[in-house]
Amino acid sequence: MSKKMKNIAQSEVLTLREQISYQEGQVVSKTLTQNQAVSITLFSFAKGEEISTHESGGDAFVTCLDGIGKITIDGVEYLLHEGESIVMPAGHPHAVCLLYTSDAADDK
């Protein structure tokens, strides 16, 4: 059987937050799986960094793993706190921005 997930340990308990690091002034991404049915990607945002407004062909499920993020969907802003999730529907303009993280690198 071929491995469907990549860049992440299998058969091991893990914390998603520890699977990606913050880098000052950057949005960092790490793809875990991608195919015609689903794409799972971890993102880390330096404070104030964002993915600007765009639309996508599929729904996007976002979970905040650390800090507070601002999600904009159809011009409406939502604050997402650690542990909270939101679905950004396909075909609707949306953006993601980090407002605050508890990571010490955030204060550099």
Question: Which sequence ranges carry the predicted segments?
Answer:
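A short, N-terminal "cap"/entry segment at the start of jelly-roll beta-barrel domains
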Residues: 1-37
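Conserved short histidine dyad/triad with adjacent acidic residue
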Residues: 26, 41-55
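Short, conserved beta-strand element in jelly-roll/cupin
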Residues: 44, 57-70
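Short beta-strand His + acidic residue motifs that chelate non-heme Fe in jelly-roll/DSBH
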Residues: 51-53, 71-72, 88, 94-99
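Structural motif
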Residues: 68-70, 77, 93
